[in-house]
């Protein structure tokens, strides 16, 4: 019997051992990961549509972002924009019955706040029981506002982030941004289609 032993809880595995005591169990996790790592043309098209949804959300963000908005207010407007366009909300990740929230918005010093998130972004979140993403901080002029959202279309996802400024970005920020673009280009040169 093939099981995904990299994500299946031990209690579940023990239950299957009791239900099928004369069976051999095989870890098919590597096979599934390899199969899912290369996308068909159909799947790539769905991922493109998810990216287009995110692109339209980023364009909308550019139109509505204003100093004085609270991070959670801004997040709510963007989340409503996405949901009205069939974003599924929670997104599935490779884990056992695990879904994650689909985005983080952080501004200014909140960009440096660590959180419970396993991803690269954090943020204080709305409260201590959900310490990640948008919080109650007011967005100010001349500070970075980062939007890191997962676009989703029919179960296929793309994770994209953009940083906005209301006003002017400082020289140090622009230098780091240039470095990030160089790293992105190097990664793109190493990648392959599918």
Question: How would you label these PLM feature ranges?
Answer:
Residues 1-194:
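Active-site neighborhoods and metal-handling regions in enzymes and metal-associated proteins
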């Amino acid at each position: 019997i093939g099981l995904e032993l990299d994500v299946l809880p031990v209690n579940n595995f023990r239950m299957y051992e009791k239900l099928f005591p004369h069976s051999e169990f095989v870890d098919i996790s590597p096979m599934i990961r390899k199969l899912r790592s290369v996308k068909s043309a159909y799947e790539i098209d769905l991922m493109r549509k998810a990216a287009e949804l995110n692109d339209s959300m980023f364009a909308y963000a550019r139109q509505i972002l204003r100093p004085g908005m609270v991070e959670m207010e801004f997040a709510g407007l963007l989340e409503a924009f996405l949901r009205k366009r069939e974003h599924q909300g929670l997104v599935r990740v490779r884990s056992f019955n695990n879904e994650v929230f689909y985005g983080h918005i952080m501004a200014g010093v909140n960009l440096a706040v660590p959180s419970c998130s396993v991803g690269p972004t954090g943020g204080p979140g709305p409260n201590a029981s959900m310490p990640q993403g948008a919080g109650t901080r007011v967005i100010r002029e001349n500070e970075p506002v980062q939007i890191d959202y997962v676009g989703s279309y029919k179960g296929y996802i793309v994770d994209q982030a953009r940083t906005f400024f209301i006003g002017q970005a400082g020289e140090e920020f622009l230098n780091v941004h240039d470095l990030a673009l160089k790293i992105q280009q190097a990664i793109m040169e190493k990648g392959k289609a599918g």
